[in-house]
Amino acid sequence: MHYDLCLTWYWEYDADFVHMLEAACTDRGLSLWQVRPHNLVEAVNSLFSGEITLGTLLNRAADNPAFSPFTHRVQELGFFCINPPEISHWAEDKATMHLELITHGIETPYTIILAPFTEQPLLPVLDLGLLGEQFVIKPAYGGGGEGVVMHASSLEQVMKARTEFADRKYLLQAQIQPQEITGRKAWFRVYYVNGKIYPCWWDPQTHIFNPLSADEEERFDLTPLRPVVAKIASVCRLDWFSTEIAFSKDGKFVAVDYVNDGIDLRSQSKAHDGVPDEVIRAIAAELVALAARHRQAS
């Protein structure tokens, strides 16, 4: 049995995205195999025995160790993976990506990178004044705000934060002050998938999304947003990801949260701080288009 697209997933809040993915597969005439906790053992057996083959893997269970035997076997068999694990792991290292982005001319906040606490428990002399009165402390790995300290202002906070994830590098970043446009912060969460870019207004305090329209891009001089995201895509080499860009008060488009692979796809119709449904639908369609293109090429 062969499936054009295999989706591994377990998070209940992915359900709306999965329904949209199913619809996109139906529209394209692609077969979809869903691997979930209830059929994981059976799926592993089918994959190892050769009973089932697949064209493309979309892994939404990368942070669940139980799925590792399945996804590792997919790699061993040479099936196409959207966001290959080795590239994803590299791209999600914020310290690495910070250096890559500035090398490629992308604006980022002023940043101090610290070695893991386990490697360097005693900090060197730091000039925190370069970060401004308040700054952000964040681990190099992780998402969803895990381990992030906003509005930090002291060395004591830095020392304490480093011990939470002691084996990870940490970033100290200057806080970016965005412009205000018609009463909204010029802060954007942007989705890149299969060469397409979907920008949204995003409030960093309330986490509320609104799609950024083409008219708004032109009217408010936000057209440089897309080339910045396209350049980030060329650097990180992921098939899909989200990023955060702020349009600063000094007129710069600044990447403030570089590359997120484990994208939260809760829908706005179900969660007030979810992603607009039309954006999720477009993402699903492009992921299926990617699988369809791979099917044609193979």
Named regions from a protein language model:
Residues 149-236:
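Phosphate-binding site of ATP-dependent enzymes
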Residues 135, 198, 241, 254-257:
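Protein kinase-like catalytic core scaffold
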Residues 68-69, 184-187, 240-241:
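Short, surface-exposed coil-to-beta transition loops
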Residues 238-250:
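A short glycine-rich, hydrophobically flanked beta-strand micro-motif that places a catalytic Asp/Glu
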Residues 9-115:
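Conserved N-proximal alpha/beta basic substrate-recognition cap immediately N-terminal to
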Residues 6-7, 75-78, 88-184, 223:
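Active-site nucleotide/adenylate-binding loops and adjacent lid/helix of ATP-dependent enzymes
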Residues 247-298:
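C-terminal active-site "lid" helix and adjoining low-complexity regulatory extension at the edge
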